[in-house]
Amino acid sequence: MNIRDRLEARSAHYSFRAKLAVVWILIFVALAVLFAAFRFDTAFMLQWLPFILAGVPLTILISIMGILLAVPLALLGALGRLSRNPVFNGISGFYVSFIRGTPLIVQIFFIYLGLPQLAQYAPGPLQGLFILGTITSGVLALGINYGAYMAEIFRAGIQSVGHGQVEAAQALGMTRTQTMRRIVLPQAIRVSIPPTGNEFIAMIKDSSLVGIVGTQELFFRASKIGRQYFQNLETLVIAALIYWLLTSIFSYFQGRLERRLARGYVREGGGPHGH
Amino acid sequence: MGTEARPVVSLRGVRKVFGDNEVLKGVNLDVGPGEVVVIFGRSGSGKSTLLRCINLLEEPTSGSVEVDGIRYEAGPGNRRRRSAMREIRSRTGMVFQDFNLFPHLSVIENVVEAPVTVNRMPRAEADRLGMRSLEKVGVADKKDEYPIRLSGGQKQRVAIARALAMQPEVMLFDEPTSALDPELIGEVLAVMKDLALESGTTMVVVTHEMGFAREVADRMAFMHEGNLIEEGPPAELVGGARDPRTRRFLEAVL
């Protein structure tokens, strides 16, 4: 027996999970070595950890508000892209194209700095609507930006519902609107939820861009302390680890949600083919 | 068919063109109350398109469709045509080859969906009506299951119940047993036979089940290259067809 055969025979004794655990442990050891190589000032890091952590609630708040704004925009965008009404179709086509085609950071600045310049044209009582705080600007920009991306997700979800479903609904006398609301959308939303979870996780990280206009969220706090004491890497490592932890937690819940959603569509229990 | 009774379905000069392919070449068809008409013929002869023109899932290129006194004249879409289209659809029930049950709804929800959404029937009343439909097709015990947990035969019977719940004037069947495993065909045909013979339902059926046609149909109509070229009671048509194309097809399938 050569070495390779002997290794394979040995390896067969251990489960995949055990081997996977070993790989993860080795990765963490490597990360620890890398961390040590940077000779970070750990006392400094521990000292400012609570200050940076205090940005977490705002980061989560901005992300949740952002996704709550993005979902209805995405739904409208998707329906518009599929609509035969030229005005609705044109506006949503522009929305998706322009917003996906320009950087989020530019959009944030346009809403935060650009909108107030238009306030002078608005009637007095409405001027306040053009001058937004950093958090509102950030939520608006994130919601509008992610709405454009998610419009494509929802559109694919709607198109994934077979034409037979539409025909069955129409054969029963349902109008186009009834067919969409009662038959197509419920099925489209089910397939759209997992990718929407992905977008939410991406949004948690992109909320750091809102820090650039001065929102006291996670990234803003980390970079502020880093610049103040010329120890940027220390605070940014903390921020990175916190973002990783946050997204891991949401990934876990996303996985559970996906399994739960699959349930209604899986043949389970006794005798699916019983007569 | 009583000659003086107004037909439930009346097609006049129905043509349907897809691109440069003329699938229907001016078909006339009358179906009287309580009548069962089986349309048969080779695949690609236009049978399904003809059936789908009755409830306007396919809009005829020219000609007219009348169902239960609601008349639809071919032409560009406008408010009047769309409303006639919906009126006709709510008076016809359709059963598809591949069932097309709504997978996100339970069996009873599938059945009450249209009565509640289209006819604005109160849910309790729709439930009673839905249960009667399910009992008629023998799947009342599955009312809370989701379609994925049903066999093909059960799915098709639920689809029949869903169409019946709209209390249609005419039931359209588009190859209702073609997607079924052979051992499940019988239960669906039995339900259809019961609808035809016991309940006196007006039916237009596109099928390859010649045994069913001979036993249940009042009239059989042979479709060939976009035309209905011969029709008559099964007893006359089978063995006594005048057109050689009908004779050849019947000899091949029987």
Question: Where are these predicted regions, by residue range?
Answer:
Chain A
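Transmembrane alpha-helices and adjacent helix-loop boundaries
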Residues: 1-275
